[in-house]
Swiss-Prot record:
Cofactor remark from the record: Binds 2 heme b groups non-covalently.
InterPro entries, sorted: Cyt_b/b6_C, Cyt_b/b6_C_sf, Cyt_b/b6_N, Cytb/b6-like_sf, Cytochrome_b, Cytochrome_b_C_euk/bac, Cytochrome_b_N_euk/bac, Di-haem_cyt_TM
SUPFAM superfamilies: a domain/subunit of cytochrome bc1 complex (Ubiquinol-cytochrome c reductase), Transmembrane di-heme cytochromes
Keywords of the record: Electron transport, Heme, Iron, Membrane, Metal-binding, Mitochondrion, Mitochondrion inner membrane, Respiratory chain, Transmembrane, Transmembrane helix, Transport, Ubiquinone
Protein name: Cytochrome b
Subcellular location per the Swiss-Prot or TrEMBL entry: Mitochondrion inner membrane
Entry annotated with the keyword Glycoprotein: no
Protein family according to the UniProt entry: Belongs to the cytochrome b family.
Record's subunit section: The cytochrome bc1 complex contains 11 subunits: 3 respiratory subunits (MT-CYB, CYC1 and UQCRFS1), 2 core proteins (UQCRC1 and UQCRC2) and 6 low-molecular weight proteins (UQCRH/QCR6, UQCRB/QCR7, UQCRQ/QCR8, UQCR10/QCR9, UQCR11/QCR10 and a cleavage product of UQCRFS1). This cytochrome bc1 complex then forms a dimer.
Source species of the chain: Struthio camelus (Common ostrich)
MF (Gene Ontology): metal ion binding; ubiquinol-cytochrome-c reductase activity
Length: 379
């Protein structure tokens, strides 16, 4: 009998073992769909981004009008741009849900997979930030100015670092040029780290909702989960296309319809919605360096999660107290997101400070404490 090329060819064999004959737990729920959704988001963003880059000019005098030209004169340019801008939002929705799933079901105990995932999140955040600057609208310019300026809080080397990043003494043409170069490069870096992420995942196999070893009950990825993933793609593309067609500017900032003007500051400088929780944490500390450290800690804290796992069970499925705390954390993040979009005035300042404190308290203190308490109650 002739050997099956799918199983013998050096390249196809890798694809087969990753996407076709991969043994998967039989009970993984829809929460396990977000990995593949992130993959399809990345592919969509790279394709639409490539098409946009063909019509974009990375120059301060031309950037804004080149984006306008793409939307007005390029065939389906408006659609490609809307898909790219809103695709970024869906990318972040998927990654936040994916991380939430990992937290809830204890997937972070696959430490290498988790750590590469956090690196992917950081790279994605960097990519989205530099991408937001490219249309060179008011919020693009001032967002870039405010966020890059944070590096000046680093003692001794801060100011030099900022001027080095800017390529001058303010955000200007060199900044835009290098941000475009970085925005072009980073998605391919993300694709590379994704392969590492998957390699580590396939070393151990997927976790499952019960958080128990599932070697005795595995099913092939294809057709079961390949079909389930296609359903997931459909369910994601429906709202994405609806947003891109019917309300493309819903999540954007109206300030970005005005070309960048270094002489006029917008009344409220705020990032895109997916960074608002971190922005709220940054603003809640009335000290520049303290705020920057809190901002960094708000994301880097994810690296500590595996070390703070004190429960004798992996998943939260059978831990009602931890579940309650988890949903408190979700509510807390929603409050932070709302606060980040509000002006810096009473009562938003104090709400933001309480929510920021609670965020770190839940992750660093309450999760391990409640886990230890549950161990006492159960065992």
């Amino acid at each position: 009998m002739a050997p099956n090329i799918r199983k013998s060819h050096p390249l196809l064999k890798i694809i087969n073992n990753s996407l076709i004959d991969l043994p998967s737990p039989s009970n993984i729920s829809a929460w396990w769909n977000f990995g593949s959704l992130l993959g399809i988001c990345l592919i969509t963003q790279i394709l639409t981004g490539l098409l946009l880059a063909m019509h974009y000019t990375a120059d301060t005098t031309l950037a804004f009008s080149s984006v306008a030209h793409t939307c007005r004169n390029v065939q389906y340019g408006w659609f490609i741009r809307n898909l790219h801008a809103n695709g970024a939002s869906f990318f972040f929705i998927c990654i936040y849900l994916h991380i939430g799933r990992g937290l809830y079901y204890g997937s972070y105990l696959y430490k290498e997979t988790w750590n590469t995932g956090v690196i992917l999140l950081l790279t994605l955040m960097a990519t989205a930030f530099v991408g937001y600057v490219l249309p060179w609208g008011q919020m693009s310019f001032w967002g870039a100015t405010v966020i890059t300026n944070l590096f000046s809080a680093i003692p001794y080397i801060g100011q030099t670092l900022v001027e080095w990043a800017w390529g001058g003494f303010s955000v200007d043409n060199p900044t835009l040029t290098r941000f475009f170069a970085l925005h072009f490069l980073l998605p391919f870096v993300i694709a590379g780290i994704t392969l590492v992420h998957l390699t580590f995942l396939h070393e151990s196999g997927s976790n499952n909702p019960l958080g128990i070893i599932s070697h005795c009950d595995k099913i092939p990825f294809h057709p079961y989960f390949s079909l389930k993933d296609i359903l997931g793609f459909t369910l994601m593309f429906i709202p994405l296309l609806s947003l891109a067609f019917f309300s493309p500017n819903l999540l954007g900032d109206p300030e970005n319809f005005t070309p960048a003007n270094p002489l006029a500051t917008p009344p409220h400088i705020k990032p895109e919605w997916y960074f608002l929780f971190a922005y709220a944490i940054l603003r809640s500390i009335p000290n520049k360096l303290g705020g920057v450290l809190a901002l960094a800690a708000s994301v880097l804290i994810l690296f500590l999660i595996p070390l703070l796992h004190k429960s004798k069970q992996r998943s939260m499925t059978f831990r009602p107290l931890s579940q309650l705390l988890f949903w408190f954390l979700v509510a807390n993040l929603l409050i932070l997101t709302w606060i980040g979009s509000q002006p810096v005035e009473h009562p938003f300042i104090i709400i933001g400070q309480v929510a920021s404190f609670t965020y770190f308290l839940i992750l660093l203190v309450l999760f391990p404490a409640i886990a230890a308490l549950e161990n006492k109650m159960i065992y």
